[in-house]
């Protein structure tokens, strides 16, 4: 992008990332990226990912699947400030 368009393009990308996405899922993904990059072994990423997949079957995860199947916008109730019980164990 030309320098004068870069900031608006970054804002547009950020908006696409957060629109109709679970705040908890975004926060967990961000933390997984930050923490797993420094992990000593790839198995750590697998363990965290497995727990995150389990969590996806509850709360906002269920709402995300239901809204997709019902072809409607999701209504997420989870807050990034109220992370799941397993966070941050890694």
Please identify what each model-predicted range represents.
Residues 1-44, 59, 75-90:
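C-terminal long alpha-helix characteristic of the crotonase
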Residues 53-59:
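Short, flexible active-site recognition loops that position polar ligands and cofactors
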Residues 60-61, 67:
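Interdomain hinge/lid region at the active-site interface
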């Amino acid at each position: 992008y030309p320098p004068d368009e870069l900031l608006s393009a970054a804002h547009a990308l950020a908006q696409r990332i957060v629109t109709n996405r679970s705040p908890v899922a975004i926060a967990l993904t961000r933390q997984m990226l930050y923490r797993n990059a420094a992990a000593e072994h790839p198995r750590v990423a697998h363990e965290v990912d497995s727990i995150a997949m389990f969590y996806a079957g509850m709360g906002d995860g269920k709402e995300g699947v239901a809204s997709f199947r019902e072809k409607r916008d999701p209504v997420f109730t989870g807050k990034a400030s109220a992370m799941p019980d397993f966070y941050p164990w890694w």
